[in-house]
């Protein structure tokens, strides 16, 4: 396998272990195809700008993809756009525009936010509205199998036909039924039954044998996964913890009914990001938008904060925590720039790292993506880098700076440095000269020029 070949270069190490929400265990990660990871993550419903709670899964799964690629996997990463939903329709009606206009506006804003946060575009970005035919075919097959039924133009999934329903949320049907209001939808055979096709004459709709309507949210992802990954069970299905039930539970139910499997081998869930201990939610009005972060420094500080928290736990976000990580990011970027400047000025080029540093990084990451310990490792490397920079030890500077850069590349945290050119090299020499003769006024002016150029 590609991954084993790459890991064996740096020694005999433990393989990647990840927590599987389906089994509630930390398990060794094994793919269906050697060296290839097929991964799907539930994307946004595009009706508004995303807040930093929405951004947490975006950042985490981008980091996961980075790490899988770092250890040698080819990653086929799909994340959808839900571009048909009651919220989109309601906003379109309020503003007197089409659903397509609303969806396009907020999808564009979403990908700009992703890019600003350092998250790369997934390999596949399926749109729900492009798979209506597949969804109707899928629903029809479930009806034929007896797993779904139609009532006056609505189609529901028949939950009690699956003994395994509740496998992801670790609840039995009787317990789940006790928590459901009995008056939600009197057309259902069972309060837990969920909609596959919704009859409607309002907003965007499609013709079907059941009458005009649109698909249920839970069906969209199953059909897109099946189509994109060519009817194969995928390796990882991810999303936020809030999607575990009912959305992901209902995806598994449909996959069990149709294919006899759980859709993915590993189900991963990212904890919530709370604001001062309270759930961040547009409906509560206590949101901080990604758009509120105006500079690359602030965006990367936010990313560093998110990526270094235990991913399955909630984050209690406040300004004090953000400022702490802003200082951390500033420490790393300043040290990295100083190190790269020393190497650049002396024309010292090397891509080497210290074997033990790389082993420590991979061992921590292989422990269910323990980025907290990786951050501690990076802080130790930073101290060693600063010492080497002060001593002018170019070999150690290069190895420590390269390792920090590799870690931050996996984290998706940008480490900016602008290499010297003829002009900035000349200014840098003048700055060193001004400092040596204690012409501090001139030195400050030259430093400002170098800072503006991104050199220091």
Predicted regions: what is each one?
Residues 5-45, 62, 112, 133-340:
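Alpha-helical recognition segments enriched in aromatics with Gly/Pro capping
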Residues 23-26, 32-118:
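N-terminal, positively charged nucleic-acid-binding surface of large information/translation enzymes
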Residues 69, 115, 143-144, 268, ...:
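Alpha-helix C-terminal capping/helix-coil junction sites
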Residues 73, 147, 455:
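Short phosphate-binding/catalytic loops that engage adenosine nucleotides
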Residues 81-85, 107-110, 120-135, 153-162:
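Short, glycine/charge-rich beta-strand/loop segments that flank catalytic centers
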Residues 93-98, 124-129, 240:
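The substrate-binding groove and active-site-proximal loops of carbohydrate-active enzymes
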Residues 279-281, 287-456:
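Structural preference for alpha-helix termini/caps and helix-kink/transition segments
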